[in-house]
């Protein structure tokens, strides 16, 4: 009996004895890094356009046109012209008066003649065949000849606005995209802002544009100029 009890006790003790187990710590897995999101590219800034010096309604009134005939692109070009060549409201009145007459109220940005009579005119820089037609009078004040177009193109390049199409295509391109700006270049090149600051008569300004006194169409120049001075709120300086 005693032997049996000892045997049972040994079994009972074995059940309550914890077996030592060696626990090997497992390394904590590294967290999977989240992918870095690609930076969202910032949109290209819109080019800043100068504000229009006058409204489309005012331009239509001065030029005797319907409002729907005055495009935003035309007004943008006018704004660029005035900003680039520092044409202030006083000079703008003279400028618009001359542009109005020379272009038939902004109807003709290329002279009526095809330009063949300018062929090989060295005084205009027309040294290559076809230059007469390609660079015939362009813009409202009819900038004429390879030489003058090249100078206009070079000036835009100097301003950081290079446009090779001016020389590659010629009058059909420039008259569409720069009718005011190429006219403003002539105005600037001939120091018309400085002249207008002396408060000259409209006829004397027309003589500088047209090349003689009294200028061709002087009554028409006066008509456009009167309306331009009226819109600018500036007294008409006289004929």
Model-derived features: positions:
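Surface-exposed patches in mature extracellular/periplasmic domains of secreted proteins
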Residues: 85-95, 108-111, 193-206, 237
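Short, intrinsically disordered N-terminal pre-domain segments
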Residues: 1-10
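Acidic helix/loop microenvironments that form the catalytic cleft of cell-wall polysaccharide enzymes
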Residues: 99-102, 196-217
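Short, mixed-charge amphipathic alpha-helical segments
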Residues: 83-88, 164-174, 196-197
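Low-complexity, Gly/Ser/Thr/Pro-rich intrinsically disordered linker/tail segments
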Residues: 208-219, 223-239
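Non-transmembrane alpha-helical segments in soluble domains
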Residues: 9, 79, 96-99, 153, ...
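Peptidoglycan-targeting cell-wall enzymes and recognition modules
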Residues: 47-77, 93-187
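N-terminal export signals and maturation junctions of secreted/periplasmic proteins
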Residues: 3, 14-80
């Amino acid at each position: 009996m005693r032997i049996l009890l000892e045997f049972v006790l040994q079994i009972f003790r074995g059940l309550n004895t914890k077996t030592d187990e060696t626990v090997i710590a497992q390394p904590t897995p590294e967290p999977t890094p989240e992918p870095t999101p690609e930076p969202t590219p910032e949109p290209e800034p819109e080019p800043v356009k100068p504000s229009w010096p006058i409204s489309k309604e005012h331009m239509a009134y001065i030029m005797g046109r319907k409002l729907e005939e005055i495009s935003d692109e035309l007004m943008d070009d006018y704004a660029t012209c005035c900003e680039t060549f520092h044409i202030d409201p006083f000079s703008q009145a003279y400028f618009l008066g001359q542009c109005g007459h020379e272009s038939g109220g902004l109807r003709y940005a290329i002279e009526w003649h095809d330009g063949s009579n300018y062929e090989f005119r060295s005084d205009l820089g027309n040294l290559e065949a076809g230059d007469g037609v390609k660079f015939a009078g362009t813009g409202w004040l009819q900038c004429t000849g390879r030489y003058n177009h090249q100078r206009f193109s070079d000036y835009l390049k100097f301003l950081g606005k290079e446009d090779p199409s001016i020389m590659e295509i010629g009058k059909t391109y420039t008259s569409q995209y720069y009718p005011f700006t190429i006219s403003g270049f002539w105005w600037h090149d001939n120091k018309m802002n400085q002249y207008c600051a002396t408060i000259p008569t409209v006829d004397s300004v027309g003589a500088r544009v047209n090349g003689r006194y009294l200028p061709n169409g002087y009554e028409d120049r006066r008509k456009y100029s009167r309306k331009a001075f009226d819109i600018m709120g500036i007294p008409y300086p006289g004929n």
